[in-house]
Amino acid sequence: MKNIIFFGDSLTAGHGLPAANSFPSLLQQRLDQESLPYKTYNYGVSGETSAGGRQRLAAVLTRHPIDVFVLALGANDGIRGIPVRETTQNLQFIVDAVRRQYPQGQLVLAGLEFPFDLGPLGGHRLAHYATEFKALFRTLADKNSLPFVPFLLQGVLGRRELNLADGVHPNAAGQRILAENVWQVLGPLLQQAVSS
């Protein structure tokens, strides 16, 4: 049995939902259905920024041998307006640390977009930040040759019926879409690894 670590924030943790409704748990069901020999571990922490993930990483890396590491951090950086350069440095640190400790492991990066509708009050600076924030994930994926989920919240962001009452966190139906978004990239990767 091989291990998949999901390292993220409240989107990964399944904030406000039973653990079984989080997208890593839903992906475990999919893996079991397809008889793929992987166990998922959900290391999502609500409210975590990329800096928090960087601090927490060492403890996570020692808990299980890692075959696949899905990095899904950055949403809280965007909400707080943390400079894109800092977020990029923190995520690069995480990528480097995982590769150093598990050189045979496979990393997958989940991309994000600025989580608010800029609207008429957004202003030029906020629009510029949103553009830079979105681009940092693809740039990081390209630089490190990482399989890339372009937008974790694709099909969910801004749709009231797919989010909790706070309008930010996906509900159970929204988490199912997140699972599908990740599976589009992760599934073929795992199937290829098993067949090779």
Where are these regions (language model features)?
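Alpha-helical cap/lid subdomain in secreted, periplasmic
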Residues: 29, 55-196
